[in-house]
């Protein structure tokens, strides 16, 4: 479903935790990271599409989040021709998005990247609100910056921009195989099996590894 200008209606989701850190998902079998997003189906409202995409990409349900705000209007980005299927070139230009800012009220272990048979992400992490966008595919960076800037007014305490040169940090969780941490590339742990907990007094999530708590 395209509008007259060739843009597909879409929703984007910025998901916050209690520390004003944002959820990033690593695209399946790729090296780029992004926020959850997806197209609005015929007959859906942006809010309905947001809740559907939230569940499909993160496993979260409406009771796990609280809507903090949304963008006033559509934000658009164009997709380079090399990423557009040949049959729709000349018609499809890109995405126009309504962005939602959500506060997670559930727990980290409510997140499940395998909620559907067609997952979008194979790892996830929390990161600073104003983290540099180097790990985001280039043609989406401007609209990400616009969405983050517009929605930052809804934060409990304004997140401060950072001049740090590093990109988004590594995924929080070590890979687990047969119950033992492995030294391979980090990936998210199956959320149906474990929760994470940070030691009291830690000032950032990077200072110590999370404790892994196996459910009975």
From Swiss-Prot:
SUPFAM superfamilies, alphabetized: Nudix
Classification via Pfam families: NUDIX
Xref: InterPro entries: Nudix_hydrolase (IPR020476), NUDIX_hydrolase-like_dom_sf (IPR015797), NUDIX_hydrolase_CS (IPR020084), NUDIX_hydrolase_dom (IPR000086), RppH (IPR022927)
Domain Nudix hydrolase, residue spans: 6-149
Cofactor requirement: a divalent metal cation
Enzyme Commission number(s) from the entry: 3.6.1.-
Disulfide bonds: none
Motif window: Nudix box: 38-59
Alphabetical UniProt keywords: Hydrolase
Function of the protein: Accelerates the degradation of transcripts by removing pyrophosphate from the 5'-end of triphosphorylated RNA, leading to a more labile monophosphorylated state that can stimulate subsequent ribonuclease cleavage.
Full protein name: RNA pyrophosphohydrolase
The organism of origin for this protein: Burkholderia thailandensis (strain ATCC 700388 / DSM 13276 / CCUG 48851 / CIP 106301 / E264)
Gene: rppH
């Amino acid at each position: 479903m395209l509008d007259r200008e060739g843009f597909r209606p879409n929703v984007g989701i910025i998901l916050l935790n209690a520390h004003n850190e944002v959820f990033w998902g690593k695209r399946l079998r790729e090296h780029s990271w992004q926020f959850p997003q997806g197209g609005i189906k015929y007959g859906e409202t942006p809010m309905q599409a947001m809740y559907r995409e939230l569940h499909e990409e993160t496993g979260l349900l409406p009771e796990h989040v609280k809507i903090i705000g949304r963008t006033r209007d559509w934000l658009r980005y164009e997709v380079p021709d090399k990423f557009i299927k040949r049959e729709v070139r000349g018609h499809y230009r890109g995405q126009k998005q309504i962005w939602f800012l959500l506060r997670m009220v559930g727990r980290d272990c409510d997140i499940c990247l395998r909620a559907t048979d067609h997952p979008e992400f194979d790892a996830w992490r929390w990161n600073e609100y104003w983290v540099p966008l180097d790990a985001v595919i280039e043609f989406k960076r401007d609209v990400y910056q616009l969405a983050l800037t517009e929605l930052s007014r809804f934060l409990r305490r304004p997140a401060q921009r950072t001049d740090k040169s590093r990109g988004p940090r590594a995924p929080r969780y070590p890979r687990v195989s047969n119950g033992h941490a492995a030294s391979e590339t980090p990936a998210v742990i199956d959320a149906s099996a474990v929760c994470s907990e940070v030691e009291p007094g830690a000032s950032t999530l990077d200072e110590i590894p999370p404790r892994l708590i196996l459910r009975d």
